[in-house]
């Protein structure tokens, strides 16, 4: 097959090629013949359906499938013929040389030159899980199951305080009538610090007027940038009641027999999974920042960056919607604000791929299986999760890409100049 190539930009190529019409027709005839032998149509015996009926009923579908398949096959052959390493998806348009001619516009991997990772400087972090970390996690689990008991004393940090508030901004009262009601846990920064400190010591039925400074960008214009008198009245004070770490509490987390040592062992295993992921994320950032600094001058494929920026915007919009917030109308150029970050992400991704290609790094089956089992172990039916991955090509492909990226990141870090830094568990997981 002959395919012509034209350079239309630093990283853009245009491939012109034609489909072999004889192969297309041969495929269509063969596929229609298969359908004729196996299909059942009312009024005809199996295998005796006239070719004209088969053509009328299935011709368009078979032709479309054959055209798509041969188009992919011919395009792939053209890419191999010209030894192109393309990125992203091609844009394929009809050509001007007849019904079966096509033009594919593609972007190619930029030339990074000799990638010498030994010149990079990477900090490798490590951490260990202590008994104190396990104790802290158990305390967190207790607090998740806490209940609240009303008390008559004054409020203190950690208490749940039901409050009524109203504000006076000059001549304007907010709300105009009545009060705003809500509840906060003191000491968690849920309200302005002035208000939280003002509530400390107040008991049920007591009130206090406070001078509160509102930021200039506050959502209520009449309060923005002003010092406002805010009156708080305590409706109720409740103290936390945390459950004891007893057999019933431990069993509620799926630990059979309620054994405390098994409970701590399970918690340690969970923390180790969390720590492993956190340390890899730190290493990924370290290596990524070094690669960006070293290869920032290399031009990235514009269309690939554009698509990545749009994907990042869509991800942020989806996150906002999941949080229950209204996104409103999105400007057509909203993705432009993501382009710098998108270009860096594309650069790191392409460099990681090039390191793997040049050094013939292959996906390690052992590491893939370990990662799959690690993910599955966080579910109640791990074997079902493993089976789901094995039966879903898209899911498995995503996992393979992730594991391969981690392999390459490790490979780079091992060969770069690196220093070791030990962190506490809490610092290590703080992203």
Swiss-Prot record:
EC number(s) given by UniProt: 5.2.1.8
Record's keyword annotation contains Transcription regulation: no
Gene Ontology MF terms in the entry: peptidyl-prolyl cis-trans isomerase activity; protein folding chaperone; ribosome binding
Taxonomic lineage: Bacteria, Pseudomonadati, Pseudomonadota, Gammaproteobacteria, Lysobacterales
Main location group: cytoplasm
Organism: Stenotrophomonas maltophilia (strain R551-3)
Record-stated family: Belongs to the FKBP-type PPIase family. Tig subfamily.
Transmembrane segments annotated in the record for this chain: none
NCBIfam families for the chain: tig (TIGR00115)
Catalytic activity: [protein]-peptidylproline (omega=180) = [protein]-peptidylproline (omega=0)
Entry keyword Cell inner membrane: no
Domain PPIase FKBP-type: 158-243
Location in or out of the cell: Cytoplasm
Keyword set, alphabetical order: Cell cycle, Cell division, Chaperone, Cytoplasm, Isomerase, Rotamase
Described purpose of this protein according to its UniProt entry: Involved in protein export. Acts as a chaperone by maintaining the newly synthesized protein in an open conformation. Functions as a peptidyl-prolyl cis-trans isomerase.
Domain free text: Consists of 3 domains; the N-terminus binds the ribosome, the middle domain has PPIase activity, while the C-terminus has intrinsic chaperone activity on its own.
Protein name: Trigger factor
InterPro entries listed in its UniProt record: PPIase_dom_sf, Trig_fac, Trigger_fac_C, Trigger_fac_C_sf, Trigger_fac_ribosome-bd_bac, Trigger_fac_ribosome-bd_sf, Trigger_fact/SurA_dom_sf
